[in-house]
């Protein structure tokens, strides 16, 4: 079996052969109070179930389809909210950036900085992120094959940063649809020499009404897609939840209802424990 790398986020070990880590929260910071409410719920549930947890939210959705769509509070206000979440709940934080200038200020506050899928080949941004020394989560672009992630890993490595997590978020299937190739998880592990792979279930459920200005979604299939991904033996899940998904300011149609978080995670933990309890069978 290929050796699996471990990336440390504080006291959390993220690896394909360790219990799964949950990277989860809300799509975009809508308000300070809502962020506190959602984070508190995640912390309560993950503590109760013994699941390692990192809170996720964006301070700026810079790639919204429509210029009229809500983007977020911006970096300055967003970082204040993240710091309060850390101080209040002792939680680790992951968020995405979109420009080189954001890299260091964001890395000074959060624990993981995320390279967006649409920007994953932007070398200047990769270099700026790498130089922070932070743990990096790389979203695999929808247009990129799983074996091409090795090139992104190489860019970060050349810049001196080996603390890389890779995130699957679906692949384009014709126009306005995404599919997840379950064989791709193993390909990504091999292409990255065993880097931790996490699965963005929420954004893999996106689809689009060609006449609309925002993404649709298929949240009713969250459970089956998450189970399929975990069954391949991966390092973590990436999900978004909201107390009222139909009122969410971004990607509500793909978001898990917050009141279903605990039963969802109970099933995910049971499945992950089962899969990782099996002896590895190496077929060549």
Curated annotation (Swiss-Prot):
Metabolic or biological pathway, per its Swiss-Prot or TrEMBL entry: Carbohydrate biosynthesis; 3-deoxy-D-manno-octulosonate biosynthesis; 3-deoxy-D-manno-octulosonate from D-ribulose 5-phosphate: step 2/3; Bacterial outer membrane biogenesis; lipopolysaccharide biosynthesis
Top enzyme category: transferase
The keyword Methyltransferase belongs to this UniProt entry's keyword annotation: no
GO cellular component, one term: cytoplasm
Subcellular location(s) of the protein: Cytoplasm
GO biological process: keto-3-deoxy-D-manno-octulosonic acid biosynthetic process
Pfam family, one: DAHP_synth_1
Reaction catalysis annotation: D-arabinose 5-phosphate + phosphoenolpyruvate + H2O = 3-deoxy-alpha-D-manno-2-octulosonate-8-phosphate + phosphate
Gene Ontology molecular functions: 3-deoxy-8-phosphooctulonate synthase activity
Documented EC number(s): 2.5.1.55
Keyword Transferase: yes
InterPro entries: Aldolase_TIM, DAHP1/KDSA, KDO8P_synthase
UniProt keyword annotations, A-Z: Cytoplasm, Lipopolysaccharide biosynthesis, Transferase
Similarity field: Belongs to the KdsA family.
Matching HAMAP family: KDO8P_synth
Protein name per the record: 2-dehydro-3-deoxyphosphooctonate aldolase
Organism: Aliivibrio fischeri (strain ATCC 700601 / ES114)
Gene name as annotated: kdsA
